[in-house]
Each structure stands twice: as C-alpha cells, then as structure tokens.
A protein has these predicted regions:
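Well-ordered beta-strand positions
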Residues: 52-53, 62, 83-85, 107
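Long amphipathic alpha-helical scaffold regions
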Residues: 69-92
Length: 164
C-alpha cells in the first residue's frame, strides 16, 4: 500500500560527499509497476544485472538464484544515457545540463556498486565575452590533457544502452 523505502546510494544531482551517502527515496508500487525492466551485463562477468528504470531513477539489482540484492539508484533525466564497453568492468552514466556534461563511471564487483570516478566539462563565459571550457575530474579542476585521456578511457568506444 505505501510502497517500499528504496535507498539511493548515488545521486547524480550532487557531486559532493553526501551523494555517496545517499538518502531514502520512497518508490511507490505504481512507479514500480510503470517502470521498465532491462537485463544487461554491466560489468562483463557474463551475468546480467537487473535494471529497473522508473520515472526518476535507474535502480540496479543483482540476482543470484532466488536472492535479489539492491545495489543503488542513480538519478536520471531526459537527456541522460549509459555507455558500456563489452568486456570492460566499468559502465558510464552521462548527464547533459545546458552548458555542462557530466560523466559518472561505476564498477560492480562482488555485488557491490562503487563509483570509479566523475569527470566533466563546462562552458564558461570569459571576461571579454568569449567562451572557454573548464574541465573537472573527481570534483576538482583538471587539465585538458587529463580530461581528454579520461574521456577516451571511459566515454568513447562503448555502445550506448537503450533504457527506453
């Protein structure tokens, strides 16, 4: 009747330390019924994880026999997506927010979801009215070189997963 309490471990709205702590988010039975379920191998171990895509979150579960373990939920919006590289152990969520692009790379190992890194770029206004890019890696400004190598490692060459 009242739904169940789903604990969100990662919230892509927030880069800070609180994002890892997460907060309880009530997922109603209606949202669960309306949600779309996908089965994908996100970590290259040849076992498919269960992804419940509800209105605001992608919720990840592992299944072993008849046991189901909730790994976490990641906040999504319309322009977001997920890429995955075949045998790679990581998968990357990307979020587009106006002039900002954020990437969140996760790994699932032994049924535990951990954040590998976050990186992104942001278009800024210079004092002379021109535009320039600022790059970030794990919440800190970084060089163009570091950003490009991280981008190549995690965000290119993978296939985009359809969550619809």
């Amino acid at each position: 009747k009242s739904g169940f309490q789903m604990y969100v471990k990662y919230d892509a709205e927030d880069f800070g330390a609180d994002a890892e702590a997460g907060y309880p988010s009530l997922l109603s039975a209606q949202k669960i019924r309306d949600g779309r379920i996908k089965y994908m191998d996100l970590n290259g171990d040849r076992k498919k994880e269960c992804i419940l895509v509800t209105e605001d979150y992608i919720n990840l579960f592992t299944m072993k026999g008849n046991k189901v373990k909730y790994l976490g939920g990641i906040h999504i919006s319309y322009m977001d997506g997920v890429t995955h590289k075949g045998k790679a152990k990581e998968f990357t969520f990307f979020r587009y927010g106006g002039r900002m692009m954020h990437y969140y790379t996760f790994r699932i190992k032994n049924a535990i979801l951990t954040k590998v890194c976050t990186f992104g770029d942001q278009v800024m206004d210079a004092s002379d009215g021109s535009l320039y890019n600022e790059y970030y890696y794990n919440d800190k400004r970084t060089s163009t070189k570091k950003y490009k190598s991280t981008y190549r490692r995690y965000a290119t060459g993978g296939k985009e997963l359809s969550l619809g």
